[in-house]
Amino acid sequence: MIRKEVFIRNDIEVNEELIYDCSKKVMQLINVDREKIKRKIVQECFNKEFCFQTNNLNKKNDIGEITLSVKNKDISVEFINNSIEKFKQDINLLYDATYLDAPMVIADLDHPFIQRNIVCNHRQDIVKKFLNKNHDISIVDEAIADERLDKVMASLNKVVKGKVNSDRRKIVINIEGVEEPVNIQNLSSGMKSFAILKTIILNGYIKDRSVLILDEPEIHLHPKWQIILADVIIQLQKEYEITCVINTHSPYFLNAIEVFAEKEKISDRCKYYLAEKSGITDVSFSIDRIYELLSDAFDTLDEIQGEE
């Protein structure tokens, strides 16, 4: 029952009609179908991520299915014509995922609308994590993280020895040995990649059992930097038991992951897969198949040289 009174709060008059409207909206929220809200959020996520092109463009009216299986429990979504037809969730995933694919996301750092989006694609998510600290991390968590990250930061500092700072006008990085802060837009693509990863880690978004997805992280990186990045990834996995999904076309980077995993005695945690037209094949016990595929380009060059 709403009391028929006029309330004065902070010099703003709140009348009976406004109170009634607010209470009505609250009741609507309480009674709304939660499954409908969940489906709406998932639909919005896919729309943002795939720009309203989730289904095969040549077969939009066919069922397109995406399934994530964790310990024999599934989260699955079926799409027809880019709209959700069926959504099934047997398990609640409470771990945050961070998807890094290109340093060009730096160009979006000053976009005025990104920070306001509730549902965002993976690049907008990176921008938010780059610019803002994770407020779910306590002071105690930060203190513990400082010790656990010593080796990780030591490796990252071989490439980017400095800290990112931002204000309303620009984002800069203070690099040791450079007299004034460097605008992050002026860094090389490789340094941008390391600066993004380092800042996201320092902001508290890589924590226990986080999910880190790296799409061809070797792009723009010198082979020596690929080795440093592999070391960082293995150290993060060892300290935080993160799930790291990596897509690579670099034999240097793949070999570096193998070497550091063996060095840190976590080779048993690594799985290797080969993407083929017929599907995804587990080649963890026959990794040579990946190297053979990656060496095809060199074989082609050898053939061309042999023709001369």
Stretches with model-predicted labels:
Residues 215-217:
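Walker B catalytic acidic pair
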Residues 211-213:
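Walker B motif beta-strand of ABC-family P-loop ATPases
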Residues 222-223, 227:
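Conserved D-loop-proximal element of ABC-family nucleotide-binding domains
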Residues 2-209, 278-308:
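Phosphate-coordinating catalytic segments in nucleotide- and nucleic-acid-processing enzymes
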Residues 228-308:
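C-terminal lobe/lid and adjacent interdomain/linker elements of RecA-like ASCE P-loop ATPase modules
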